[in-house]
Amino acid sequence: MTELPRLPAQGGCSNAPILKQRGQREVFCGLTGIIWLHRKMQDAFFLVVGSRTCAHLLQSAAGVMIFAEPRFGTAILEETDLAGLADAQAELDKVVDQLLARRTDIKQLFLVGSCPSEVIKLDLSRAAERMTEKYAPSVRVLNFSGSGIETTFTQGEDACLASMVPVLPKTDTRQLLLVGALPDVVEEQAVSLLEQMGIGPIKVLPAPRADTDLGIGENTVFALTQPFLGDTHGALERRGARHLPAPFPFGEEGTTAWLRVIADEFGVDADTFERVTAAPRARARKAISQASEALRGKTIFFFPDSQLEIPLARFLTRECGMEAIEVGSPFVHKGIIGSDLEMLAQGPVISEGQDVDLQLDRCRAARPDLTVCGLGLANPLEAEGLATKWAIELVFTPVHFYEQAGDLAGLFSRPVRRAGLLKVEAAE
């Protein structure tokens, strides 16, 4: 197959020093992952064991009312629970009994830890084991933490998927596993492209239903669709599955490279690959070219938020003509984002973790044309004359693969255009 143009090793950021700082950080907690996971897993329920603050976060972030009976809820820890005056395990059993009696459609129940449950050391793993014995085989009960003490924004999904891997059945079937929650229409596009190349069987984690025929074994190869799945990556390898390292499928170049790694693994010939990808590649290039006109020559600064930052910086610098000043990520897992680091030209500061005050100082000194940051930082930076993009939008908006490449570029070009218009109006 014809190789993608690659930067020489000395030109990429694979060996660039990583600035590691620890201090005050500004991120959402991992509970926010429930917002997209509950839509993907149609027979699952996410029961957060937490405070009223946790409940308000989920309800407002999801944009649904509780009377609509979504597939998530909160078991409220009262003052008696927090003070140790009540048996929290017994109270949790009562809540789960009531929930499963009312919602007979639930086949997977996730007990989700929060800051309050972590503080009082409530052992949800023990509760999950106890409930699994009680409700099996009708309901599978698992647990993971979405606590802000332990997790950042997107780590909730990682913790959820990692909790599922050990209980998946063993299979010896040669198969491809796509790992990471994607919007249904995006997932269908990816699967369709791979199937047109003759690749199969293709499985997806998370599967929409617990009874889906999904197993893991030594003949399973997996490709990550999200760069924040470090724990899931490790859990799959411990089950014998093999990772296919690749750039992440953002933009035309990243999508083509991601597909090519899989195609090479399954012996797809160059003509077939070209036939399947030529048209969508051309559409993606055209869409990116139109959407990124305002981005060329502009500078960008990433605060750490979702772990999407390094792949997105690669896309914006190589396909949209931007210059990255700093690319901050909560974690830099080179086994996962190594290919993107290799393709990211030397120059930007690569930072892991956060001391938000020090990072704000660097951002103010650099005065980038666009700053990607969390909601809490956006308004203050806008007030200082810096254009911003909410990092959360990059997770909740379909941005993967060819057909969304133009939309991805547009997410960054719109605030840059808006800032330009505001400057013109101010000058007048």
Curated annotation (Swiss-Prot):
Nucleotide-binding as UniProt keyword: yes
Cofactor requirements of the protein: [4Fe-4S] cluster
InterPro entries named in the record: LIPOR_BchN/ChlN (IPR050293), Nase/OxRdtase_comp1 (IPR000510), Protochl_reductN (IPR005970)
Binding site for [4Fe-4S] cluster: C29, C54, C115
UniProt entry keywords in alphabetical sequence: 4Fe-4S, ATP-binding, Bacteriochlorophyll biosynthesis, Chlorophyll biosynthesis, Iron, Iron-sulfur, Metal-binding, Nucleotide-binding, Oxidoreductase, Photosynthesis
UniProt-recorded Gene Ontology molecular function terms: 4 iron, 4 sulfur cluster binding; ATP binding; metal ion binding; oxidoreductase activity, acting on iron-sulfur proteins as donors; oxidoreductase activity, acting on the CH-CH group of donors, iron-sulfur protein as acceptor
Top-level EC class as recorded in UniProt: oxidoreductase
Cofactor binding note: Binds 1 [4Fe-4S] cluster per heterodimer. The cluster is bound at the heterodimer interface by residues from both subunits.
Reactions catalysed: chlorophyllide a + oxidized 2[4Fe-4S]-[ferredoxin] + 2 ADP + 2 phosphate = protochlorophyllide a + reduced 2[4Fe-4S]-[ferredoxin] + 2 ATP + 2 H2O
GO biological process: light-independent bacteriochlorophyll biosynthetic process; photosynthesis, dark reaction
Record-annotated membrane-spanning stretches: none
Pathway named in the protein's UniProt entry: Porphyrin-containing compound metabolism; bacteriochlorophyll biosynthesis (light-independent)
Any single Pfam family the record assigns to this protein: Oxidored_nitro
Quaternary structure and partners: Protochlorophyllide reductase is composed of three subunits; BchL, BchN and BchB. Forms a heterotetramer of two BchB and two BchN subunits.
Family matches, as NCBIfam families: DPOR_bchN, PRK02842.1
Protein's job: Component of the dark-operative protochlorophyllide reductase (DPOR) that uses Mg-ATP and reduced ferredoxin to reduce ring D of protochlorophyllide (Pchlide) to form chlorophyllide a (Chlide). This reaction is light-independent. The NB-protein (BchN-BchB) is the catalytic component of the complex.
Recorded family membership: Belongs to the BchN/ChlN family.
Full protein name: Light-independent protochlorophyllide reductase subunit N
Organism name: Roseobacter denitrificans (strain ATCC 33942 / OCh 114)
Gene that this sequence comes from: bchN
